[in-house]
Amino acid sequence: MEMERVHEFPHTHMDRRPRKRARLGWDVLPQATKAQVGMFCGQEIGNISSFASSGAPSDNSSSLCVKGVARNGSPPWREDDKDGHYIFELGDDLTPRYKIYSKMGEGTFGQVLECWDRERKEMVAVKIVRGVKKYREAAMIEIEMLQQLGKHDKGGNRCVQIRNWFDYRNHICIVFEKLGSSLYDFLRKNNYRSFPIDLVREIGWQLLECVAFMHDLRMIHTDLKPENILLVSSDYVKIPEYKGSRLQRDVCYKRVPKSSAIKVIDFGSTTYERQDQTYIVSTRHYRAPEVILGLGWSYPCDVWSVGCIIVELCTGEALFQTHENLEHLAMMERVLGPFPQQMLKKVDRHSEKYVRRGRLDWPDGATSRDSLKAVLKLPRLQNLIMQHVDHSAGELINMVQGLLRFDPSERITAREALRHPFFARRR
């Protein structure tokens, strides 16, 4: 029986062509005959009996191939669910190398499982992508991007580190270092309480440093959001938070991460910079105005997302909570002021309905009274930040205004933002 190729790094080439997946030794159904000898490539061979050598792959080859016999004890073959998600049980083996311990999360792409790596003797996070063509293709793009980032991020301090990847039962599986919770999950479990300003400063600097690093490599992440920023450690401390007047204060406690170290994840939507990119990118709350208006986008769309994230860390809530384009644009004007007329004159034909007589068609274009209320309740950016920040508010407001400039050509770059006085206190 021919076994499939399992990949370890470094890679010298990636073939994106679709192919029929060879059946794995651990995919054999219970009634099958004894495991047969076959070719097995990569470091998974450490879990194959009759292994000839324990040497690691050389730098000159993408994998190491030896003959081996697959072990028994693989989980029974299960059909995927109707959406193409992999069906598993805790304690299952995911290839002979990885043992499933828990489910860490899920999304439209698939699931993330906490697994024990028998070879490295450590816990890892394994992203199991849905067995659907478009998600498999996106996973291969993510792997390529992770490889490129890994080549240049020698210290591994900016982006999540990929350990391995393989194709198992029609699911692309990407093995990552195990990190802590996402910023979103931390906020949610903390009842959406804001972060202290010094922590916002540290996280903001790291995030901008990662974005600047990617932009230097001509990469655009396109999906920056709190869900895609992980704390390296989930450890936290509780600090008192005082509410009410000085005479009668109620004390409650909120969680604060012990460490400010973060890493960016999810590079499935990452693309290289090129002309005329007009398709929709980014998750709604963090989507830049040029994307909504069909004006084309580039590096500045990431910078806009960072600005929204920094405000959210200061307040505990997403800045623009909407799911409709015109309402979203109206919220932007409410918080940041009117759009430049030259931007509104250039909108594409799909976005013309949002503009009337050179201005945003609001409030006339509002679809409901609730929509009007949602926009009117938003304060100006300065007032919003000052409600939550005691010191450094002026510097923070100035920097965020630069990150959230409507015109992408006038928006500050990530590298410029790193030199802003707001970050002087950390240097």
UniProtKB/Swiss-Prot annotation:
Cited SMART domains: S_TKc
Domain of life: Eukaryota
GO biological process: mRNA processing; protein autophosphorylation
A Pfam match: Pkinase
Record flagged with keyword Protein biosynthesis: no
Molecular-function annotations in GO: ATP binding; protein kinase activity; protein serine kinase activity; protein serine/threonine kinase activity; protein serine/threonine/tyrosine kinase activity; protein tyrosine kinase activity
Catalytic activity entry: L-seryl-[protein] + ATP = O-phospho-L-seryl-[protein] + ADP + H(+); L-threonyl-[protein] + ATP = O-phospho-L-threonyl-[protein] + ADP + H(+); L-tyrosyl-[protein] + ATP = O-phospho-L-tyrosyl-[protein] + ADP + H(+)
Protein's name according to its UniProt entry: Serine/threonine-protein kinase AFC2
Gene: AFC2
